[in-house]
Amino acid sequence: VDSLTDAGFAVNPTIQALYTSDDWAQYKRGSENLGSFGNNLLSINDAPWSAFDADARSSVSQYGDAAIMVIGRIGGEGTDLLGKSKDGIDNGDGIGPDYLQLNANETSILDGLKEMKASGEIKHIIVLINYAGMIEGDFLADPDIDAALWVGALGVGGEAIGHLLIGDVSPSGRLPDTMWVDNAKNPVLVNYGRNYYSNLDEFGITDPDGANESTFSTYTVYQEGMYLGYKYTETRYEDLVLGTANVGDYDYASVVARPFGFGLSYADFELSGMSVTREGDRDYVVNVTVTNTSDTYSGKCSVPVYVSKPYGDYARENQIQVPSVELVDFGKTKILAPGESETLTITVDEKLFASYD
């Protein structure tokens, strides 16, 4: 809230008072430990649309330039995502299949805001994704959502949000991971979960049903190799386009909501004059000129450098994994005013081109 007011936004005091009230203390994210390190049942626990009384809803139109919805999750070291949540994605009870989907309460808020937008009470709907990872992004296809900003885990960086939304600063980052339309289409889920050793009792490890389950009672076998995230989605799409054998059916648009490296800016940029030269024994030097072609906004531009390697006979015969595209480095301009240019020089070590057997 301070970020918004510091940037010049007028924040609805009625809604703010609800979220800070004792009655609404029940609505907060949390986790319930299930008896071992890293084994937590996570709770989304956002307030449903029905929790907003008539006074709260009527106050919205007085601040109707935009409704900002924050979608948050927790998780990290010691708090693995179990693929399900305490409150689930159904109607508030039971266990849902995916903690990273919107749950029923969040969907009800979004639907309520859409109704207010349709009636003219609010003009825009903005979604902020407050999570260090990626939630399931199918809902972003909704045309009633005017803007979305992945803000990660905020910390001291939260102060920038208001200035980004109001246009004092142009966004210049890019997504550090793939945002899936449906997490079930992510191949890592095939191996994800808690697999218990069948003979754990022989070694004095607590039984899975015991009260003090040991951290050492479970295991995971990783099978996906290099084909994680964008290295999977882009490689499979290339195989489809090239007619590679055994690729199967693959609809990129129904799998990827936003690709790795996706990012927008208020400014427009044009890249030109790219050259690649070899220097020394192992360096490749990429030069590219970036020009801000917009008339109004200044901003920085992130320029990723990818390598695409041929999948030759040797790799095929020896079953060497070669993704169709790999990020090897990136550069970023200074703040460019409209019409201003900068030439970036990005040096890439040849070792990053290697494939490992």
Tell what function each PLM region has.
Residues V1-D357:
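C-terminal non-catalytic regions of proteins with extracellular/luminal or membrane-system context
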